[in-house]
Amino acid sequence: MLQQVPTRAFHVMAKPSGSDCNLNCDYCFYLEKQSLYREKPVTHMDDDTLEAYVRHYIAASEPQNEVAFTWQGGEPTLLGLAFYRRAVALQAKYGAGRKISNSFQTNGVLLDDEWCAFLAEHHFLVGLSLDGPPEIHNQYRVTKGGRPTHKLVMRALTLLQKHHVDYNVLVCVNRTSAQQPLQVYDFLCDAGVEFIQFIPVVERLADETTARDGLKLHAPGDIQGELTEWSVRPEEFGEFLVAIFDHWIKRDVGKIFVMNIEWAFANFVGAPGAVCHHQPTCGRSVIVEHNGDVYACDHYVYPQYRLGNMHQQTIAEMIDSPQQQAFGEDKFKQLPAQCRSCNVLKACWGGCPKHRFMLDASGKPGLNYLCAGYQRYFRHLPPYLKAMADLLAHGRPASDIMHAHLLVVSK
Protein backbone atom coordinates (compact mmCIF):
# COMPACT_ATOMS: atom_id res chain seq x y z
CA MET A 1 0.00 0.00 0.00
CA LEU A 2 1.28 3.47 -0.86
CA GLN A 3 2.43 5.62 2.02
CA GLN A 4 -0.28 8.15 2.85
CA VAL A 5 1.31 10.29 5.57
CA PRO A 6 4.51 12.25 4.79
CA THR A 7 7.50 11.73 7.06
CA ARG A 8 7.46 15.28 8.47
CA ALA A 9 5.05 18.17 8.94
CA PHE A 10 3.92 19.76 5.68
CA HIS A 11 1.37 22.13 4.16
CA VAL A 12 -0.49 22.14 0.85
CA MET A 13 -1.85 25.45 -0.40
CA ALA A 14 -4.54 25.35 -3.09
CA LYS A 15 -4.90 27.70 -6.04
CA PRO A 16 -8.41 26.77 -7.20
CA SER A 17 -8.63 29.71 -9.61
CA GLY A 18 -5.14 29.08 -10.99
CA SER A 19 -3.69 32.41 -12.08
CA ASP A 20 -7.10 33.85 -13.00
CA CYS A 21 -7.69 37.23 -11.36
CA ASN A 22 -10.04 40.19 -11.69
CA LEU A 23 -7.21 42.69 -11.14
CA ASN A 24 -4.07 43.49 -13.10
CA CYS A 25 -1.53 44.43 -10.45
CA ASP A 26 1.71 45.46 -12.13
CA TYR A 27 3.98 43.59 -9.75
CA CYS A 28 2.05 40.29 -9.60
CA PHE A 29 4.27 37.29 -10.32
CA TYR A 30 1.39 34.83 -10.74
CA LEU A 31 -0.86 36.34 -13.42
CA GLU A 32 1.43 35.18 -16.21
CA LYS A 33 1.34 31.54 -15.06
CA GLN A 34 -1.66 31.12 -17.37
CA SER A 35 0.98 30.66 -20.08
CA LEU A 36 1.83 27.29 -18.55
CA TYR A 37 -1.70 26.04 -19.24
CA ARG A 38 -2.34 27.48 -22.68
CA GLU A 39 -3.50 24.12 -24.03
CA LYS A 40 -6.11 23.82 -21.26
CA PRO A 41 -8.02 27.10 -21.09
CA VAL A 42 -10.19 26.05 -18.11
CA THR A 43 -8.38 27.46 -15.08
CA HIS A 44 -10.87 26.77 -12.29
CA MET A 45 -10.76 23.71 -10.05
CA ASP A 46 -13.55 21.26 -10.85
CA ASP A 47 -15.50 19.19 -8.32
CA ASP A 48 -13.44 16.03 -8.81
CA THR A 49 -10.17 17.86 -8.16
CA LEU A 50 -11.61 19.69 -5.16
CA GLU A 51 -12.74 16.41 -3.64
CA ALA A 52 -9.39 14.77 -4.37
CA TYR A 53 -7.57 17.66 -2.72
CA VAL A 54 -9.70 17.63 0.43
CA ARG A 55 -9.67 13.85 0.75
CA HIS A 56 -5.94 13.39 0.11
CA TYR A 57 -4.91 16.33 2.28
CA ILE A 58 -6.87 15.08 5.29
CA ALA A 59 -5.65 11.50 4.75
CA ALA A 60 -2.04 12.69 4.60
CA SER A 61 -2.25 14.59 7.90
CA GLU A 62 -1.45 13.03 11.27
CA PRO A 63 -4.71 12.38 13.18
CA GLN A 64 -3.67 14.60 16.10
CA ASN A 65 -2.73 17.56 13.89
CA GLU A 66 -4.93 20.36 12.65
CA VAL A 67 -5.52 20.23 8.90
CA ALA A 68 -4.92 23.78 7.68
CA PHE A 69 -6.49 24.51 4.29
CA THR A 70 -5.23 27.61 2.51
CA TRP A 71 -6.98 29.03 -0.56
CA GLN A 72 -5.12 31.47 -2.78
CA GLY A 73 -4.86 32.52 -6.40
CA GLY A 74 -5.07 34.27 -8.71
CA GLU A 75 -8.20 35.46 -6.98
CA PRO A 76 -10.02 32.66 -5.14
CA THR A 77 -13.35 34.51 -4.84
CA LEU A 78 -13.80 34.10 -8.61
CA LEU A 79 -15.03 30.55 -7.99
CA GLY A 80 -18.03 31.84 -6.07
CA LEU A 81 -19.43 30.95 -2.67
CA ALA A 82 -20.87 27.62 -3.84
CA PHE A 83 -17.34 26.28 -4.36
CA TYR A 84 -16.32 27.01 -0.78
CA ARG A 85 -19.59 25.73 0.65
CA ARG A 86 -18.81 22.46 -1.09
CA ALA A 87 -15.23 22.56 0.21
CA VAL A 88 -16.47 22.95 3.79
CA ALA A 89 -18.97 20.12 3.28
CA LEU A 90 -16.22 17.85 1.94
CA GLN A 91 -14.01 18.72 4.90
CA ALA A 92 -16.82 17.63 7.22
CA LYS A 93 -17.34 14.45 5.18
CA TYR A 94 -13.71 13.33 5.23
CA GLY A 95 -12.60 15.03 8.44
CA ALA A 96 -14.22 12.54 10.82
CA GLY A 97 -14.11 14.97 13.72
CA ARG A 98 -10.65 16.29 12.91
CA LYS A 99 -9.74 19.90 13.68
CA ILE A 100 -9.83 21.74 10.36
CA SER A 101 -9.07 25.39 9.63
CA ASN A 102 -9.35 27.52 6.51
CA SER A 103 -7.45 30.61 5.43
CA PHE A 104 -8.11 32.64 2.36
CA GLN A 105 -6.10 35.30 0.54
CA THR A 106 -8.05 37.83 -1.49
CA ASN A 107 -7.90 41.26 -3.08
CA GLY A 108 -11.31 41.87 -1.52
CA VAL A 109 -13.03 43.28 -4.59
CA LEU A 110 -15.83 40.69 -4.68
CA LEU A 111 -16.46 40.48 -0.94
CA ASP A 112 -19.96 41.42 0.17
CA ASP A 113 -22.19 40.74 3.17
CA GLU A 114 -23.01 37.21 2.04
CA TRP A 115 -19.35 36.34 1.56
CA CYS A 116 -18.36 37.79 4.92
CA ALA A 117 -21.20 36.07 6.77
CA PHE A 118 -19.98 32.75 5.34
CA LEU A 119 -16.35 33.46 6.22
CA ALA A 120 -17.33 34.37 9.78
CA GLU A 121 -19.63 31.37 10.22
CA HIS A 122 -16.89 28.94 9.19
CA HIS A 123 -14.07 30.78 10.95
CA PHE A 124 -11.99 31.51 7.85
CA LEU A 125 -8.86 33.58 8.41
CA VAL A 126 -8.75 36.12 5.58
CA GLY A 127 -5.57 37.66 4.22
CA LEU A 128 -6.52 40.95 2.56
CA SER A 129 -4.11 42.60 0.13
CA LEU A 130 -3.80 46.30 0.95
CA ASP A 131 -0.61 48.27 0.34
CA GLY A 132 -1.40 51.36 2.41
CA PRO A 133 -3.01 54.75 1.70
CA PRO A 134 -4.61 55.43 -1.72
CA GLU A 135 -1.64 57.09 -3.40
CA ILE A 136 0.58 54.09 -2.57
CA HIS A 137 -1.93 51.28 -3.07
CA ASN A 138 -3.30 52.58 -6.37
CA GLN A 139 0.11 52.94 -8.00
CA TYR A 140 0.30 49.23 -8.83
CA ARG A 141 -2.95 47.57 -7.68
CA VAL A 142 -5.40 48.32 -10.48
CA THR A 143 -8.30 46.70 -12.34
CA LYS A 144 -8.05 45.10 -15.78
CA GLY A 145 -9.02 48.51 -17.14
CA GLY A 146 -6.31 50.28 -15.16
CA ARG A 147 -8.65 51.84 -12.60
CA PRO A 148 -7.67 52.28 -8.92
CA THR A 149 -8.86 49.69 -6.40
CA HIS A 150 -8.25 51.31 -3.01
CA LYS A 151 -11.88 52.24 -2.33
CA LEU A 152 -12.97 48.70 -3.21
CA VAL A 153 -10.46 47.17 -0.82
CA MET A 154 -11.36 49.56 1.99
CA ARG A 155 -15.00 48.57 1.49
CA ALA A 156 -13.94 44.94 1.88
CA LEU A 157 -12.01 45.77 5.05
CA THR A 158 -15.08 47.47 6.53
CA LEU A 159 -17.21 44.41 5.72
CA LEU A 160 -14.71 42.03 7.33
CA GLN A 161 -14.72 44.16 10.47
CA LYS A 162 -18.51 44.46 10.46
CA HIS A 163 -18.93 40.67 10.36
CA HIS A 164 -16.09 40.03 12.84
CA VAL A 165 -14.14 37.94 10.36
CA ASP A 166 -10.62 37.11 11.51
CA TYR A 167 -8.27 38.80 9.07
CA ASN A 168 -4.79 40.12 8.52
CA VAL A 169 -3.47 42.55 5.96
CA LEU A 170 -0.77 41.62 3.45
CA VAL A 171 1.29 44.60 2.36
CA CYS A 172 3.54 44.40 -0.69
CA VAL A 173 6.53 46.68 -0.20
CA ASN A 174 7.69 48.11 -3.52
CA ARG A 175 10.23 50.72 -4.55
CA THR A 176 7.84 53.58 -3.83
CA SER A 177 6.22 52.43 -0.60
CA ALA A 178 9.56 51.45 0.93
CA GLN A 179 10.31 55.15 1.25
CA GLN A 180 7.14 55.81 3.27
CA PRO A 181 7.12 53.22 6.09
CA LEU A 182 5.24 55.20 8.72
CA GLN A 183 2.66 56.47 6.26
CA VAL A 184 1.88 52.85 5.40
CA TYR A 185 1.95 51.58 8.99
CA ASP A 186 -0.04 54.43 10.53
CA PHE A 187 -2.66 54.25 7.80
CA LEU A 188 -3.27 50.58 8.56
CA CYS A 189 -3.37 51.17 12.31
CA ASP A 190 -5.83 54.04 11.87
CA ALA A 191 -8.02 51.71 9.78
CA GLY A 192 -8.26 49.28 12.70
CA VAL A 193 -5.86 46.66 11.35
CA GLU A 194 -4.14 44.63 14.08
CA PHE A 195 -2.30 41.92 12.12
CA ILE A 196 0.09 42.93 9.34
CA GLN A 197 2.61 41.18 7.11
CA PHE A 198 5.10 43.05 4.92
CA ILE A 199 6.15 41.28 1.72
CA PRO A 200 9.09 42.59 -0.34
CA VAL A 201 8.41 42.90 -4.06
CA VAL A 202 11.41 41.53 -5.96
CA GLU A 203 11.11 40.46 -9.60
CA ARG A 204 13.46 40.34 -12.58
CA LEU A 205 12.68 40.56 -16.27
CA ALA A 206 12.69 37.25 -18.10
CA ASP A 207 15.74 35.91 -19.87
CA GLU A 208 15.43 34.31 -23.32
CA THR A 209 14.78 30.83 -21.93
CA THR A 210 11.93 31.93 -19.68
CA ALA A 211 10.49 34.23 -22.34
CA ARG A 212 10.11 31.25 -24.68
CA ASP A 213 7.54 29.86 -22.23
CA GLY A 214 5.50 33.06 -22.62
CA LEU A 215 6.64 34.49 -19.28
CA LYS A 216 7.77 38.08 -18.72
CA LEU A 217 9.42 37.54 -15.35
CA HIS A 218 12.62 35.67 -14.59
CA ALA A 219 12.43 32.15 -13.20
CA PRO A 220 14.30 31.45 -9.94
CA GLY A 221 17.97 30.73 -10.37
CA ASP A 222 21.44 32.02 -9.68
CA ILE A 223 21.67 34.12 -12.84
CA GLN A 224 21.63 37.86 -12.35
CA GLY A 225 18.98 39.68 -14.36
CA GLU A 226 17.51 43.12 -14.86
CA LEU A 227 15.26 44.15 -11.99
CA THR A 228 11.75 45.41 -12.62
CA GLU A 229 11.18 49.09 -11.90
CA TRP A 230 8.88 48.29 -8.96
CA SER A 231 11.30 46.00 -7.11
CA VAL A 232 12.23 47.27 -3.66
CA ARG A 233 15.86 48.26 -3.09
CA PRO A 234 17.57 46.08 -0.44
CA GLU A 235 18.78 48.89 1.81
CA GLU A 236 15.42 50.65 1.65
CA PHE A 237 13.56 47.48 2.61
CA GLY A 238 15.81 47.16 5.65
CA GLU A 239 15.24 50.78 6.63
CA PHE A 240 11.50 50.33 6.07
CA LEU A 241 11.37 47.44 8.55
CA VAL A 242 13.60 49.21 11.08
CA ALA A 243 11.48 52.38 10.97
CA ILE A 244 8.31 50.39 11.57
CA PHE A 245 9.93 48.34 14.33
CA ASP A 246 11.11 51.48 16.17
CA HIS A 247 7.65 53.00 15.84
CA TRP A 248 5.92 49.80 16.95
CA ILE A 249 8.08 49.14 19.99
CA LYS A 250 7.39 52.60 21.40
CA ARG A 251 3.60 52.37 21.29
CA ASP A 252 2.10 49.17 19.85
CA VAL A 253 3.63 46.08 21.51
CA GLY A 254 0.77 43.75 22.41
CA LYS A 255 -1.70 45.77 20.33
CA ILE A 256 -0.43 45.47 16.74
CA PHE A 257 1.10 42.22 15.52
CA VAL A 258 3.60 42.57 12.68
CA MET A 259 4.45 39.11 11.38
CA ASN A 260 7.96 40.14 10.31
CA ILE A 261 8.65 40.99 13.95
CA GLU A 262 6.92 37.86 15.25
CA TRP A 263 9.11 35.68 13.02
CA ALA A 264 12.28 37.43 14.16
CA PHE A 265 11.31 36.94 17.80
CA ALA A 266 10.53 33.25 17.23
CA ASN A 267 13.97 32.67 15.71
CA PHE A 268 15.63 34.68 18.48
CA VAL A 269 14.17 32.54 21.28
CA GLY A 270 14.41 29.28 19.33
CA ALA A 271 10.66 28.79 19.06
CA PRO A 272 8.82 27.30 16.09
CA GLY A 273 6.73 29.53 13.90
CA ALA A 274 9.18 31.49 11.77
CA VAL A 275 8.27 31.77 8.11
CA CYS A 276 9.88 29.32 5.64
CA HIS A 277 12.33 31.80 4.11
CA HIS A 278 13.88 32.44 7.53
CA GLN A 279 14.31 28.74 8.30
CA PRO A 280 17.45 26.68 7.51
CA THR A 281 15.60 24.47 5.01
CA CYS A 282 12.25 24.55 3.23
CA GLY A 283 10.34 22.29 0.86
CA ARG A 284 7.47 21.32 3.16
CA SER A 285 4.96 23.82 1.75
CA VAL A 286 3.79 22.82 -1.70
CA ILE A 287 0.96 24.14 -3.85
CA VAL A 288 -1.77 22.40 -5.82
CA GLU A 289 -2.93 24.10 -8.99
CA HIS A 290 -6.49 24.14 -10.31
CA ASN A 291 -6.04 20.85 -12.22
CA GLY A 292 -4.34 18.94 -9.40
CA ASP A 293 -0.74 19.63 -10.46
CA VAL A 294 1.53 19.93 -7.43
CA TYR A 295 4.59 22.22 -7.42
CA ALA A 296 7.54 22.61 -5.06
CA CYS A 297 6.50 26.07 -3.85
CA ASP A 298 4.23 29.00 -4.60
CA HIS A 299 7.22 30.86 -6.07
CA TYR A 300 8.40 27.88 -8.12
CA VAL A 301 5.44 27.15 -10.36
CA TYR A 302 7.53 26.23 -13.39
CA PRO A 303 7.63 22.95 -15.35
CA GLN A 304 10.95 21.84 -13.83
CA TYR A 305 9.49 22.10 -10.30
CA ARG A 306 6.31 20.11 -10.95
CA LEU A 307 6.15 17.14 -8.57
CA GLY A 308 3.16 15.32 -10.02
CA ASN A 309 -0.61 15.46 -9.92
CA MET A 310 -3.05 14.88 -7.09
CA HIS A 311 -5.07 12.51 -9.30
CA GLN A 312 -2.12 10.20 -9.94
CA GLN A 313 0.12 10.38 -6.84
CA THR A 314 -0.30 10.67 -3.10
CA ILE A 315 0.81 13.79 -1.27
CA ALA A 316 3.38 11.68 0.58
CA GLU A 317 4.88 10.45 -2.69
CA MET A 318 5.31 13.99 -3.96
CA ILE A 319 6.41 15.87 -0.86
CA ASP A 320 8.79 13.10 0.25
CA SER A 321 10.18 12.56 -3.26
CA PRO A 322 13.96 12.83 -3.74
CA GLN A 323 13.32 15.85 -5.99
CA GLN A 324 11.44 17.76 -3.28
CA GLN A 325 13.79 16.65 -0.51
CA ALA A 326 16.72 18.03 -2.50
CA PHE A 327 14.80 21.24 -3.20
CA GLY A 328 14.29 21.87 0.50
CA GLU A 329 17.79 20.86 1.61
CA ASP A 330 19.43 23.03 -1.06
CA LYS A 331 18.20 26.10 0.81
CA PHE A 332 20.95 25.43 3.33
CA LYS A 333 23.43 23.47 1.24
CA GLN A 334 23.74 26.22 -1.36
CA LEU A 335 24.33 29.06 1.09
CA PRO A 336 27.47 30.93 0.01
CA ALA A 337 30.40 31.28 2.41
CA GLN A 338 29.47 34.89 3.11
CA CYS A 339 26.15 33.74 4.57
CA ARG A 340 27.63 30.90 6.61
CA SER A 341 29.97 33.30 8.41
CA CYS A 342 27.38 36.08 8.84
CA ASN A 343 26.44 37.09 12.37
CA VAL A 344 22.72 37.24 11.50
CA LEU A 345 22.62 33.82 9.81
CA LYS A 346 20.35 32.31 12.47
CA ALA A 347 17.85 35.12 12.02
CA CYS A 348 17.95 35.19 8.23
CA TRP A 349 19.06 31.76 6.97
CA GLY A 350 19.68 33.25 3.55
CA GLY A 351 16.10 34.30 2.88
CA CYS A 352 13.98 32.83 0.09
CA PRO A 353 15.97 30.92 -2.57
CA LYS A 354 13.94 32.75 -5.22
CA HIS A 355 15.82 35.93 -4.32
CA ARG A 356 19.32 34.39 -4.29
CA PHE A 357 20.52 35.70 -7.61
CA MET A 358 23.43 37.90 -6.53
CA LEU A 359 27.15 37.20 -6.17
CA ASP A 360 28.72 37.28 -2.72
CA ALA A 361 31.89 39.19 -1.80
CA SER A 362 34.07 36.40 -3.19
CA GLY A 363 32.19 36.28 -6.50
CA LYS A 364 30.25 33.11 -5.70
CA PRO A 365 26.58 32.90 -6.70
CA GLY A 366 23.70 32.44 -4.28
CA LEU A 367 23.60 35.64 -2.23
CA ASN A 368 20.12 36.96 -1.51
CA TYR A 369 19.30 40.20 -3.30
CA LEU A 370 17.85 41.53 -0.03
CA CYS A 371 20.99 40.73 1.98
CA ALA A 372 21.86 44.33 2.86
CA GLY A 373 18.31 44.98 4.03
CA TYR A 374 18.16 41.83 6.12
CA GLN A 375 21.48 42.68 7.74
CA ARG A 376 20.27 46.16 8.65
CA TYR A 377 17.05 44.81 10.15
CA PHE A 378 18.35 41.75 11.98
CA ARG A 379 21.32 43.60 13.47
CA HIS A 380 19.01 46.26 14.86
CA LEU A 381 16.61 43.93 16.70
CA PRO A 382 18.57 41.79 19.25
CA PRO A 383 18.70 44.24 22.21
CA TYR A 384 14.95 44.71 22.04
CA LEU A 385 14.15 41.04 21.42
CA LYS A 386 16.31 40.09 24.40
CA ALA A 387 14.55 42.63 26.61
CA MET A 388 11.14 41.26 25.60
CA ALA A 389 12.28 37.66 26.12
CA ASP A 390 13.56 38.56 29.60
CA LEU A 391 10.27 40.21 30.47
CA LEU A 392 8.33 37.12 29.43
CA ALA A 393 10.73 34.85 31.34
CA HIS A 394 9.95 36.84 34.50
CA GLY A 395 6.21 36.60 34.01
CA ARG A 396 5.77 40.11 32.70
CA PRO A 397 4.11 41.08 29.40
CA ALA A 398 6.39 41.98 26.50
CA SER A 399 4.48 45.26 26.26
CA ASP A 400 6.27 46.45 29.40
CA ILE A 401 9.20 47.25 27.12
CA MET A 402 7.29 50.38 26.15
CA HIS A 403 8.00 51.85 29.58
CA ALA A 404 10.49 54.67 29.19
CA HIS A 405 13.16 53.20 31.49
CA LEU A 406 13.34 49.99 29.40
CA LEU A 407 13.19 51.48 25.94
CA VAL A 408 16.09 53.22 24.26
CA VAL A 409 15.70 53.29 20.48
CA SER A 410 19.03 53.31 18.67
CA LYS A 411 19.84 56.33 16.59
UniProtKB/Swiss-Prot annotation:
S-adenosyl-L-methionine binds at Y27, G74, S129, R141. Its cofactor is [4Fe-4S] cluster. [4Fe-4S] cluster 2 binds at C276, C282, C297, C352. [4Fe-4S] cluster 1 binds at C21, C25, C28. Keywords: 4Fe-4S, Iron, Iron-sulfur, Metal-binding, S-adenosyl-L-methionine. The keyword Iron applies. Binds 3 [4Fe-4S] clusters. The first cluster is coordinated with 3 cysteines and an exchangeable S-adenosyl-L-methionine. Signal peptide: none annotated. Transmembrane segments: none annotated. Gene3D superfamilies: Aldolase class I. CDD domains: Radical_SAM, SPASM_anSME. Belongs to the radical SAM superfamily. Anaerobic sulfatase-maturating enzyme family. This is Anaerobic sulfatase-maturating enzyme homolog AslB. It comes from Escherichia coli (strain K12).
